[in-house]
Amino acid sequence: MFFRNKICDIAPGFITLVLARILTGFAHGVYFSIGSTIAASLVPEEKRATAISIMFAGLTLAIVTGVPLGTFIGQHFGWRATFIGVSILGIIGLAASLLLVPNNLKNGKSASLKSQFKVLGNKRLIFAFLMTAMGYGGTFVVFTYLSPILQKITGFQESTVTFILLIYGIAIAFGNLLGGKVANKNPLKALLWMFAAQGLVLFAFYFTVSSPVLSIITLFLLGALSFVSVPGLQLLVVQIAEKELPGTEDVASGINIAAFNIGIAIGSYAGGIIVTSSLGLASTPWIGALFLVITVLITLYSIRLSKKD
């Protein structure tokens, strides 16, 4: 990470910068997939979702603090300075991993390349990946355009929107930790209620978005629910892989991270189509809610599959 961000810092042109960012992005899926399984292995089985939620809380806190801090550094010291800062954080992260991650971790069963490809053929895992992609697709239909929604529809000033987004980020971190506790015992059942609640709040946001007070209340609830399912989804994927394809836990976890990013791309793209169509910005909440309706149906079918097994 240090060297890749350093390449961004010294990039002579746009193409080099983009290629360096792509190289940096390769580490994202690997880090979070392996990090999830390591976090889950460090605690008793009944606390695995909580451990995963704590790890992902670091991501949400980094987004809440890092985005405004990076913007500040870029505005005052230039965009290259932000990559220098990220490179330094990479060194700190490496040192922390070397010092804090135990060396005596139990090695899981190794899996052949053929068995790893079987992850994409496992019905239960496929539906878990679909839950991730559709659930976060619904989130990002709205989240991608949240700032213009709050300014153009709700009527907030840009400076106020920045503060509201900070509150939204805090709610995300809170929801992430809460999701870990709720999903510890039965992640699949917990996910059903999480997705249903998120869909209802997204639908409610369609009606409250024009009211400053009601929109803030709805946004706090939406923030708490936006990433609440992350720990449960990661735990579910790991549990299915452990049971049906031992040794492929890291691979399954990595594909789930990929599904998360695919969901972001789908949601953002769908939101863009809606915003530029006759439906407009105001329709993004109920379109996002439709994504969650589909996610709930997928989850119900996944519960049915688990009962058969």
Predicted regions and their residues:
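Paired small-residue
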Residues: 3-4, 12-24, 213-221
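Helix-breaking motifs and short loop linkers at transmembrane-helix boundaries and internal kinks
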Residues: 10-16, 155, 208-210
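Cytoplasmic helix-loop-helix junction between adjacent transmembrane helices
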Residues: 12-16, 20-58
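A membrane-interface helix-boundary motif in multi-pass transporters
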Residues: 75-88, 273-292
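C-terminal membrane-cytosol helix-exit motif in multi-pass small-molecule transporters
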Residues: 87-106, 298-299
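Extracytoplasmic gate region of multi-pass secondary transporters
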Residues: 124-166
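Helix-to-loop junctions at the C-terminal end of transmembrane segments
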Residues: 175-187
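A late C-terminal transmembrane helix in Major Facilitator Superfamily
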Residues: 240-279
